[in-house]
């Protein structure tokens, strides 16, 4: 996702998160797998009762693959309250395209395919 919008149930209050990165390279549309040359925007959104968690790599898919081949695994997760105001940013020491948040136990759970043990659990800050 390039843009995530937070709004109330009436739709009269909206806050927009716009992934601020370098411009999109239109020439990549003419190349096989060319989109992978552009920085990945927000990847996953996981809501809880109190917060919304959004993940992203901050890199191009090519860079992610190259880093992962070298054993350099990381990604970012941003935590927002329901009005769209930032609370916290985490840099995780693994990379995943599957993220779940347990709001009751305050844990972030990831499933990866880069590790022999694919399950990662992070205790989030209160």
Language model: regions and residue ranges:
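Eukaryotic scaffold repeat domains enriched in small/polar residues
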Residues: 1-126
């Amino acid at each position: 996702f390039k843009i995530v919008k937070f709004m109330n149930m009436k739709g009269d209050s909206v806050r927009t998160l716009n992934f601020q990165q370098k411009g999109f390279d239109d020439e990549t549309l003419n190349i096989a797998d060319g989109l992978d040359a552009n920085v990945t925007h927000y990847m996953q959104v996981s809501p809880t009762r109190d917060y919304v968690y959004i993940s992203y790599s901050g890199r191009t898919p090519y860079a992610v693959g190259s880093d992962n081949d070298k054993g350099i695994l990381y990604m970012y997760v941003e935590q927002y309250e329901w009005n769209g105001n930032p609370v916290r940013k985490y840099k995780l020491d693994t990379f995943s395209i599957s993220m779940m948040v347990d709001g009751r136990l305050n844990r972030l759970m990831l499933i990866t395919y880069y590790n022999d043990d694919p399950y990662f659990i992070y205790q989030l800050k209160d």
